[in-house]
């Protein structure tokens, strides 16, 4: 905006200089009026923007001061406190639990919590823990049975539940597990398996099952044995086929071809133009076509100029 204002002012100065030379020019007069209006509008906009910036700066200062005055509240949790802990390995929601142990120092503290609705234990950081509402805390403290579940550890052997637990039901949330444990079918087994997770129940149930070893067949099929002669025959089969085809062609060529009903058989290649003679020096080439090789040979002609002079 400031650069535009400077440009408008410089243009107005040029127009005023030209008007001094030609004061009766109407176009320059109109241009001068337009530039003056533009300059006034831009100045008003600049003033408004400066005022807005001041207000925002003051508001931000007030906000920062107010923020600094309110100090963040840090709650130091200790073992035995009732809190709302997040089920990190499950549905990532908060459930009522009790802190059993604290490890680490400062921001790296780790809290070992035991959920009240189900007996699994997890180790989480401070960001996964929040204070429990006062009403809910008083309600849980008044109910002694819930507190006993999280503090007592039974050494009696675990009894199998009356109904089989499916694998899909083990991956449900703690609230679903609590509702299932409160059903009439599971009440008798919940008191015994209060501190044992469903995964441990299934593992113990599988360990009690009898181990079944595979029964070998009474009459196993005989292993096919390949002798050396069979291998040799397989390797010689292609060679034998090739030799048989060669022999059949040789027999056909030796037998010859009949020219007529009573005619003599002619061997294949007997009347061929490419057939070489039976003599030892016989050879085949495009010039003699099977004639006997001659002893003479063609020499290169050399021109003799003296023969021309004598003539």
UniProtKB/Swiss-Prot annotation:
Top-level taxon of the source organism? Eukaryota
Which SMART domains would you find in this protein's record? TUDOR (SM00333)
Keyword Phosphoprotein tagged: yes
- Compartment(s): Nucleus
Point to the regions of Polar residues compositional bias: 168-183
Task: Report one GO cellular component.
Answer: nucleus
What the entry lists under PANTHER family is as follows: ZINC FINGER CCCH-TYPE WITH G PATCH DOMAIN-CONTAINING PROTEIN
Locate the compositionally biased regions of type Basic and acidic residues.
Answer: 301-311
Give the originating organism. Answer: Schizosaccharomyces pombe (strain 972 / ATCC 24843)
Name it: Splicing factor spf30
What is the protein's quaternary organization?
A: Associates with spliceosomes.
> By its UniProt entry, which InterPro entries does this protein fall under?
Crb2_Tudor (IPR041297), Tudor (IPR002999)
Q: Name one Pfam family in it.
A: Tudor_3
Q: Which residues carry this modification: Phosphoserine?
A: 173
